[in-house]
Amino acid sequence: AKKTLKNFKKGNNFYYWYRVKKEAQIIAKQRNKKESLNYIVAEFDKIEKPNNKILFDIANFYKNSKKYEKAIKYYTAIIDSIDKNSEIKPDLLYRRGGSYERIGLYKKADKDLLYALKISPDDAYVLNYLAYSWLERNYKINEAITMLETAYSLKSNDPYIIDSIGWAYYLTDDYLKAEKFLKSAVELMPDDPIVND
């Protein structure tokens, strides 16, 4: 596989970047994520005019490596460059909002996530993420529960959404409902430490 990847030269940004991404993934699997990130960043810096696809990839690599400020920088660059009605905007807002939330910039996080929901009100994952963030902050609990109930109606077999709604009921002392949902979450994903905490 590596020999094939080497054939993608730097002259063609698309194929060059495809090779770089694949090699970074191989490094992450065979060695470690830090080395993988260092490699892809070094290669990214060699590209004079990265397009939005490349910016999106590097932002995701930073986000997955918990380098949230860097991720925000590149998500913002894409958001600023695309049409306001672009179909990819809600996903970018979700990713940037999640990055803001991770570093405690909750006002900016809420703004992005609510904007994403304004564009795509039936996105179960954005509903779940924002609602869970509010639960953790003890903020707008009733609204958070309503959002989670909507998310559950859209994705009734998702263990993370089921776990979130169970946690919401637990926080509001509705222990019977909480037990039902939390048990269901564990059954759907018994080996996940997040669900089993």
Report the location of each language-model feature:
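Single-residue signature of alpha-solenoid repeat helices
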Residues: 4, 36-37, 71, 109, ...
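Hydrophobic/aromatic packing residues within the alpha-helices of TPR/SEL1-like helical repeat arrays
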Residues: 5-8, 40-41, 68, 75, ...
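Structural marker of alpha-solenoid helical repeat scaffolds
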Residues: 10-13, 46-47, 81-85, 119, ...
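Alpha-solenoid helical repeat scaffolds
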Residues: 17-23, 53-57, 87-95, 125-129, ...
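Residue-level recognition of tetratricopeptide repeat
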Residues: 25-26, 60, 98, 132-133, ...
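Register position in tetratricopeptide repeats
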Residues: 29-30, 64, 95-98, 102, ...
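Short coil/turn linking the two alpha-helices of tandem helical-hairpin repeats
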Residues: 31, 83-87, 135-139, 173
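TPR-repeat structural position
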Residues: 33-34, 68, 106, 141, ...
